[in-house]
Structures are given as structure tokens and as C-alpha cells.
Amino acid sequence: MSKVKTKDLLLEAGKKSFLEKGYNNSGIESILQEAGVPKGSFYHYFENKEDFGLKVLDRFAECIGERQEVLLCDESVPPLERLRNYCGMVSDALRSDECRKGCLVGNLSQEMADQSEVFRARLEEIFESWVDRYAACLKQAQVAGEVSPDLDVRELAEFWLNSWQGAVLRAKTMRSPAPLHTFLDVMFGNILSVRR
């Protein structure tokens, strides 16, 4: 098995375990079994569990960032439609497992932000990168006349992230996409629809 494939298998098994059980309840042994690789392979790629967890988080953030770039930066689509399409993609992914897993970044924020400063700082960087992308798209919507010029797009992007993460958490708790639909209805039907 190639080195790249082995590392990828470990990272994917880690993501699966963290989403299903959380970071603290995920054991290296069970991750190795899931990946089908020997124990020595783990320490070849990762210094310890925290290093592994951060690499899993980085891989997840990289994948989400790529999806955000594709969906939120496609200037052939109106800005608000891009945001709606992005939320639709995330909603579909969450519904595919009956909303049981939630968002890895949100989950790890709740679990690790007060346990590891390294995790907390990295999670905040990821959230800030998401806010940056939302704000850029919302600014384009504002320029296009889709959003009120009176709104502070950075503040709106922060509100978007905070509200969306809350909706994802509630969807996980309820095992229902209803909170996601409520978020979209209120955001697009009330907050973003007010133009001056």
C-alpha cells in the first residue's frame, strides 16, 4: 500500500470516528482497524493523537473550503443563489445520515475548544475563513442589489455562520433537517429579503 493511500485511509477513518463518537471517545486502535493498517503506520505519519486530530480537521476544512470556493465564487450564478446552493449541498450531506453526525468543525469546537488551545485556535481559523467567504459572497450580493446596502456584510456573515452552526447542532439533536429549513426560510425570506 502506498504511503499516501495509507495516510488517506487513516485520515478518513479518523474523520468517520470523530463524527460518530467524538474526538475523546475515538481510540487509535479502532481507527487503525477501520483503516485496515498496522499500528506502526500511525506513528509514521502522526506524532500523537492531537497531531492526528488536527490533520483530520485540516483535511476536512480543506474539503469544505474547496466546495465553498466552487459554490460561493461561481460568478455565473447570482450571489444569493450561490449561498442557497451551498446550504443545499450541506443540507443534503447532513440528511444522508439522518442528521446524526453534524459538522466536524462544530462538533470539535464544542468538544475541544476548552481542552486544547491548539485545537481552539485552529477551529477559530477555520470558522474565520468561512466567514470571509460568506462575507465576500454577501458583498457581491449587496453590489448586485440583492441585499440592503445598509447591512454590514461582515456582521451578517458572522450571524450567518453562528446561526447555521446552531441549526446544524439542532438538526443533529432532533435528527431532522427541520432546523436547517427554518434557518433558510428566515435568512432568505426575512433577513436577506429586506432591501432599501
Identify the residue ranges that each predicted region occupies.
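Hydrophobic alpha-helical connector segments
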Residues: K55, V70-K101, V153-W160
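C-terminal peripheral helix-coil segments that are non-catalytic and often amphipathic
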Residues: N85-A93, E128-A144, R154, E158, ...
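N-terminal intrinsically disordered/low-complexity leader segments
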Residues: M1-K5
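Generic hydrophobic, amphipathic alpha-helix propensity
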Residues: T6-G14, I31, V56-F60, I64, ...
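Amphipathic alpha-helical segments used for helix-helix packing
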Residues: R82, D97-V118
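Helix-turn-helix
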Residues: L9, S17-D51, K55
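Amphipathic, non-transmembrane alpha-helical scaffold segments
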Residues: L11, L57, A61, R120-V131, ...
